[in-house]
Design a protein with these regions (language model features):
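Conserved active-site motif detector
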Residues: 1-212
Length: 212
């Protein structure tokens, strides 16, 4: 059995309507997500599922099949949201993104879960560590009890015409949302207060401009 597998992989949304989940506060950059493997009429499909059991998107057939093979070997699979993008063409446009996909042997679950937590933290800050690691690097993860992290970086894909990067890191509000998730009610209330104040400021600004 392989001990480790890691890469960045593009995923797509089923429709623009389904992209609401991807753009919402339930899906943050750096979130650790579940990968659900299905088979439909002989075609492998790997779905990215967020912490709230909502579907974020899906991987292409070839990569889905590769993940199915890793799962058959016994590897645990996770997907970490790296960025969200929108492309204008083909019309009416498409929401998509990339996830850091990691597979690991459950024999080293403690070490790799700690490693994944570290990767999530970096990605949440907009830092994309290299994940295609060789044997010695995998040994570093295990021997350090998961505290070792790659120093090499993976650049964002080059922007094309008509392409916009919508989420690449966590912002201030995202930090408050995450604190609210973990039970910090004060941060949760503060996040809503901030949003309401922002909306109020926009309305006041529009009124002062004579919009309504």
């Amino acid at each position: 059995m392989e001990r480790y597998f890691g890469t960045y992989q593009t995923f797509r949304t089923v429709s623009k309507k389904d992209a609401a989940v991807l753009m919402g506060s339930n899906t943050l950059v750096g979130d650790r997500n579940r990968i659900n493997l299905t088979m439909d009429e002989g075609v492998h499909r790997a779905w990215l599922i967020n912490k709230f059991n909502e579907t974020i998107g899906y991987f292409d057939d070839g990569f889905s099949r590769e993940l199915s093979l890793f799962a058959a070997e016994g590897l645990e699979l996770v997907g970490i949201l790296s960025f969200v993008a929108f492309t204008e063409t083909p019309e009416p446009g498409e929401y998509w993104g990339q996830a850091a996909v990691i597979g690991y042997s459950p024999h080293y679950a403690e070490e790799f879960n700690r490693f994944i937590d570290g990767v999530c933290g970096l990605i949440g800050k907009g830092i994309r560590p290299k994940l295609a690691l060789n044997g010695p690097a995998v040994d570093e993860i295990i021997n350090s009890n998961g505290t070792w992290l790659p120093s090499e970086r993976e650049p964002l894909p080059e922007k094309q015409r008509g392409m916009a990067l919508l989420k690449t890191r966590r912002g201030f509000i995202d930090g408050l949302v995450e604190a609210g998730r973990t039970g910090n009610k004060g941060c949760y209330i503060l996040s809503w207060a901030f949003l309401l104040a922002l909306v109020a400021a926009i309305i006041i600004g529009l009124k002062s401009c004579g919009v309504f």
